[in-house]
Regions:
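RNase H-like nuclease fold core
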Residues: 4-66, 77-78
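RNase H catalytic domain
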Residues: 28-34, 73-143, 147, 152-154
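Loop-to-helix element that buttresses phosphate recognition and phosphoryl-transfer chemistry
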Residues: 67-71
Length: 155
């Protein structure tokens, strides 16, 4: 997993002080197709972006976690592209924050690479995390969930 490879490459980007983004991210997994889906509901000043897709990594057993970390990386990269100086990642998977900050051990290559990629991206943008309970009625979190399912062909 490489931040530069998950959604294209971001070249140098000058952020605008005070410009903030908020992204609700989620992952899903389609057992039948063997695809991890990612969903990002991203708000930047004066814009809303809905991003979704799938990641296919044969032999990878991380299932929806692959979609979760991909969504977070794409959200951060997109905020950098939008010249934001700060992004809040709202997630329902505690690992999104805990692997990034090093609070949890990174026992598999996916979480190790995610930690490295997020920390590299943090050189260009201030990243904070906010946990929400999954399927708790939060409309925007539900939207990210639907996007992730759509990304891997579940809806």
């Amino acid at each position: 997993m490489n931040a530069r490879g998950c959604a294209g490459r971001i070249m140098k980007s000058k952020s605008i002080r005070g410009r903030q983004a908020k992204a609700l991210v989620d992952g899903s997994y389609n057992e039948r197709k063997g695809l991890a889906g990612f969903g990002v509901y991203l708000r930047v000043p004066n814009k809303v972006h809905e991003l979704y897709g799938y990641v296919d990594r044969p032999g990878d057993s991380s299932k929806n976690i692959l979609g979760e970390v991909t969504a977070a990386l794409i959200a951060i990269k997109y905020a950098i592209k939008e010249h934001c100086s700060k992004i809040t990642i709202v997630h329902d998977c505690k690992g999104i924050e805990k692997w990034a900050t090093g609070e949890w051990k990174r026992n598999i290559p996916l979480t190790q690479a995610y930690h490295e990629d997020v920390n590299e991206l943090m050189k260009s943008i201030d990243v904070s995390f906010q946990h929400v309970k999954a399927h708790s009625g939060d409309e925007n979190n539900n939207r990210a969930d639907k996007l992730a399912k759509q990304g891997c062909g579940l809806k």
